[in-house]
Amino acid sequence: MDFPTLSSYLHHHRPGEDILADLHTDPGLGLTAEAVAQRYEQYGRNELKFKPGKPAWLRFLLQFHQPLLYILLIAGTVKAFLGSWTNAWVIWGVTLVNAIIGYIQEAKAEGAIASLAKAVTTEATVLRDGQNLRIPSQDLVIGDIVSLASGDKVPADLRLLKVRNLQVDESALTGEAVPVEKAVELLPEETPLAERLNMAYAGSFVTFGQGTGVVVATANATEMGQISQSMEKQVSLMTPLTRKFAKFSHTLLYVIVTLAAFTFAVGWGRGGSPLEMFEAAVALAVSAIPEGLPAVVTVTLAIGVNRMAKRNAIIRKLPAVEALGSATVVCSDKTGTLTENQMTVQAVYAGGKHYEVSGGGYSPKGEFWQVMGEEVDNVLLDGLPPVLEECLLTGMLCNDSQLEHRGDDWAVVGDPTEGALLASAAKAGFSQAGLASQKPRLDSIPFESDYQYMATLHDGDGRTIYVKGSVESLLQRCESMLLDDGQMVSIDRGEIEENVEDMAQQGLRVLAFAKKTVEPHHHAIDHGDIETGLIFLGLQGMIDPPRPEAIAAVHACHDAGIEVKMITGDHISTAQAIAKRMGIAAEGDGIAFEGRQLATMGPAELAQAAEDSCVFARVAPAQKLQLVEALQEKGHIVAMTGDGVNDAPALKRADIGIAMGKGGTEVARESSDMLLTDDNFASIEAAVEEGRTVYQNLRKAIAFLLPVNGGESMTILISVLLALNLPILSLQVLWLNMINSITMTVPLAFEAKSPGIMQQAPRNPNEPLITKKLLHRILLVSLFNWILIFGMFEWVNRTYDDLALARTMAIQALVAARVIYLLSISQLGRSFLGYVTGKRQTITKASILLLGIAVAIALQIGFSQLPFMNVLFKTAPMDWQQWAICLLPMIPMVPVAILANRLDP
């Protein structure tokens, strides 16, 4: 027997009775043990199923799947075949070091999917064979009758059959901060996920009331499961840096293979021995490969990680460090990211006057200001008017939630909206405990969707009914209203509705408050007591407010040329209001789209909408992913922030996924490239700054490393063409490219940021790794290095008639010149003279640079003076006069370095 799954039917569009009939479920008895066993066999357990990740050994082997490493592996193998085992082991060692570095960098991508299982594991109350049982959520099957109560996590996707004041927090799925009040009525087929009131989805939480539903989807068929499947389909995107390195590597591979083959063919054709020509070809290949570059890149990124950690941004995947610096768009979830995720009363209308309330979140600290008009400053109130006090008092009395002081923070136990009312009353000096003794509650009418209000009966100075609810439900029941001076007049519904409209346009959720005095013998209340005779007390407008520091961060992003787009599951009016408050959307910028509009768009139209608008509301998880992809197709480097399960696929797809470390779900964290430990959007701006600094320093490293490779390659190629002895051997090249280069280049990773780095526009994502200016620099310095190596080698060889000494002095002269070039490159964009005169930075900040130079010098001394190094690298010891000669190239390097800085500032 086949049973429907989530993908088979739109359950919100079908009557509950029809679904029960299709599932052969008796709503009074539930499933039988036999039926449960059959469905276990057909559907399996209610747990998410995932593709297994790559094993560790395979991830390690894949590190060798790089074009440049192919050359080294082949060269080492041929060397071994020819009997040059020392050379072979050194070359293989270089490839192994690079593979280990890459393996360490490998992200734990499978962790994101595995954490989804944790997000939905819970217990459930289920009706089977007429008995209510408490079972693990994994044991649920389609057709089970499940009961929900306050505090429960929804264990599977349910079509609701009965509800009693049921409210569900679906923020992890939809981004909606306010719990959703559930119902059982049929809904239109096109109803978006966030508005399916007759459904309860796996992974959401019950905040209030009770309900009963039938399981219509389990495991991967749930909405949560659909998210996991979409994540499995996501390919881990390359960051701009890794894309550029891949392109650079392939280009370099073709050039190296061509030149090596050309070198071998020309040398052999001129009568050279195949063995010698192979040594020349290997030396050329090894010299052209910047072996130290992967290690330098890793160290530079790791230093960026450390700097970001100090600024509350934890990097999970190293390439994301640099990618942040090239971000052109930040797509942010609203709830809990740009906003506090704590409902806060910000405006009150009472007695015909308007008041603003300061303070954020659930903290009882704040002040009341009377709004005097556009051209007059607001007035801070010393004492509150009676009608304002009465309005606030009603919000606290007519309330089933509580505020708790947890360390430095305040939290609500219960409904967030009621928490906001408690906080606003506490700011006026009211205490829940105090009011409970002064005005004890005698009876209450809980909030119901049919009536849209809650009422409580209290004793005290007479018996009074206090009511809170929607404006529509209370206005029709009110006959009079209190003015500021305590005078009671006939209610002016038109004026109140105008004020409600004004507050709604600010993105505020508005509740109305009223009271009614009853006879002393009144011990209980019913809906009949609320029908007429209410006295209108006022309105309270609340919102999940923007974080103040996030507002500043949005402006900083704009200054840096980065667009900020809000993608949320919230209402469009609320999203637009928040966007305007934060500066995401300018005044008068009305371009905003809802999920239902996006669903009707084709790919081209969607891409244009993603480009033009900065506010997207009522967006489903799949649409968040589509928006990120659309922006990427437009050429943007996209950073996506989020904290809910609904954000996970988009976080994984984005060039940089940014999750909240405190308030975020485990799924979002595991899907991300970066975590914000303080859940502060402002930390993104700091991370972007560090990302730009990382790229700046990587560029310096490339500008320093490649001219050496260029000089070495030119030296070997020209020597073969002219049938001369090789001035430098393959093992000596590896020493220069790995040991010396890494020692001297790593200090560049510690360079401070350039002034005004956050006032620059984002880099063009299509800009190549080697720009024209950088290429000119590389060619100039490569030419100098070739002249230096070749000239020193020829002079020493003719003077001393010693090949080993000639090669040793050529290398030492090159390293001496590199010291000057390093000093110039370390202040790229400024003159070399600026460093000498101390204008660049203090000696303390340059200490790492000087340490790197000192270590490099010590290693070079050992390279030529230690006997075992002479044997391994075929070098020769030098006397002090020869050392002095090797220092002379430092002098001509000064003007070359200055010219290079002018070519590539």
Swiss-Prot record:
Which residues are in coiled coils?
none
GO MF, any single term: ATP hydrolysis activity
Which residues are catalytic?
333
Q: What is this protein called?
A: Cation-transporting ATPase pma1
- Specify the protein's topology with respect to the membrane: Multi-pass membrane protein
Which SMART domains is this protein grouped with? Answer: Cation_ATPase_N (SM00831)
Q: Which Gene3D superfamilies match?
A: Calcium-transporting ATPase, cytoplasmic domain N, Calcium-transporting ATPase, cytoplasmic transduction domain A, Calcium-transporting ATPase, transmembrane domain, HAD superfamily/HAD-like
Report the subcellular localization.
Cell membrane
Q: Which reaction does it catalyse?
A: ATP + H2O = ADP + phosphate + H(+)
Task: Note the Pfam families from the entry.
Answer: Cation_ATPase, Cation_ATPase_C, Cation_ATPase_N, E1-E2_ATPase, Hydrolase
Q: Does the keyword rRNA-binding apply?
A: no
Cellular component annotations (GO), alphabetically ordered: intracellular membrane-bounded organelle; plasma membrane
